[in-house]
Design a protein with these regions (language model features):
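N-terminal helical capping/dimerization or prosegment-like subdomains
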Residues: 1-66
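Beta-strand secondary-structure signal
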Residues: 39, 116, 170-174
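Short glycine-aspartate micro-motif
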Residues: 51-53, 83, 144-148, 170-172
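Flexible glycine/proline-rich, aromatic-decorated loop/lid segments
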Residues: 162-176
Length: 181
């Protein structure tokens, strides 16, 4: 949404700062046809090390209708031991866990692979800029494995590991029939 363009830029910049603080040697905001991408990379310095590409997104669903919120959606709150905030479950919470795990491994000297991060700002509207961004930056995004945390869980009490994704599929079905019974 164009009305939130500045908010999206601030959010992207904050993620860039967090990735730099976590230990990435290169971080940048990269323009696209829509909201910018956040790119960061860490090179471990070991020859022939594999590269992990971490994908996430920083956009969130619209806050409306406000009356359905039990607390201010713009301020995080904890109720019954759970965190409630915009994007806490899709996908900022998962992204923060990945960044903090990366930060720990780097600062403890345990990171033995190269890591690249790519965070987009349009996942909630179907990622219209993602395909062209990947095409334009194919070499930059090259990796041995991709880590995505924006997946489903079997249930609220059952953590899950998704081992493969195949993309999005859209259908439009038109049904016609007789004009009378």
């Amino acid at each position: 949404q164009t009305e939130h363009k500045e908010d999206m830029l601030r959010c992207a910049e904050r993620w860039r700062e967090l990735l730099l603080e976590a230990g990435c040697q290169r971080t940048e905001i990269m323009p696209s046809n829509g909201n910018p991408f956040v790119y960061a990379e860490y090179k471990c310095g070991l020859d022939d090390s594999p590269t992990v590409l971490v994908y996430s997104h920083y956009d969130v669903m619209p806050v409306e209708p406000l009356e359905l919120w039990h607390s201010n959606p713009w301020e995080p709150s904890i109720r019954d031991g759970r965190l409630y905030a915009r994007g806490a479950d899709d996908d900022k919470g998962q992204a923060m866990i990945q960044v903090k795990a990366f930060e720990y491994l780097v600062h403890e000297g345990l990171m033995k692979c190269n890591v690249k991060f790519i965070f987009e700002g349009e996942e909630e509207i179907g990622s219209p800029s993602l395909e062209s961004f990947i095409t334009d930056h194919r070499d930059l995004l090259k990796a041995d494995i991709i880590l995505v945390s924006d997946t489903s869980m079997i249930g609220k009490e059952t953590p899950s590991i998704t081992t493969g994704l195949r993309g999005l599929a859209y259908w439009q079905i038109e049904v016609t029939g007789p004009n009378r019974d």
